[in-house]
Amino acid sequence: MADDLDFETGDAGASATFPMQCSALRKNGFVVLKGRPCKIVEMSTSKTGKHGHAKVHLVGIDIFTGKKYEDICPSTHNMDVPNIKRCDFQLIGIQDGFLSLLQDSGEVREDLRLPEGELGREIEQKYDCGEEIITIHGARFTTS
């Protein structure tokens, strides 16, 4: 579903990321690993050794592709954290390959195409069974 959405929009002057000290990151939070916005699924810290700072080992899953990334950084260094926006919509219909989604504001959004493949079939099946909530994660994020 992420392939069909526009994640390049945001408020004027909004930054794609903000810095956070590595030691302040937490599991289930977000971080940029290898240039990709990831959700942190594993995190461990090594003790300070005689040759430097404590190190933090991070394992994250790309929020758009599901690919796994890892990185190790000193606990005192800053890492980029992506600005993530989470939106819940009520799925009120599927017509001609597009989703009809009710926003919190009461407006209906009908510009999102039903994803192809397994994800699209799963959404249709859940809708047919009465599930109506769709969560969309968006990030104002660009790769260079």
From Swiss-Prot:
The name this protein goes by in its record: Eukaryotic translation initiation factor 5A-1
Keyword tags: Acetylation, Cytoplasm, Elongation factor, Endoplasmic reticulum, Hypusine, Membrane, Nucleus, Protein biosynthesis, RNA-binding
SUPFAM superfamilies, alphabetized: Nucleic acid-binding proteins, Translation proteins SH3-like domain
Disulfide links within the chain: none
Modified residue annotations for Hypusine: K50
Subcellular location(s) of the protein: Cytoplasm; Nucleus; Endoplasmic reticulum membrane
GO MF terms held by the record: ribosome binding; RNA binding; translation elongation factor activity
Membrane-protein topology: Peripheral membrane protein
Example GO BP: positive regulation of translational elongation
Assembly: Binds to 80S ribosomes. Actively translating ribosomes show mutually exclusive binding of eIF5a (EIF5A or EIF5A2) and EEF2/eEF2. Interacts with DAPL1; interaction takes place at the polypeptide exit tunnel of hibernating ribosomes and prevents translation.
Family of the protein in this entry: Belongs to the eIF-5A family.
Location (main, coarse): cytoplasm
Taxonomy of the source species: Eukaryota, Metazoa, Chordata, Craniata, Vertebrata
GO terms for cellular component: endoplasmic reticulum membrane; nucleus
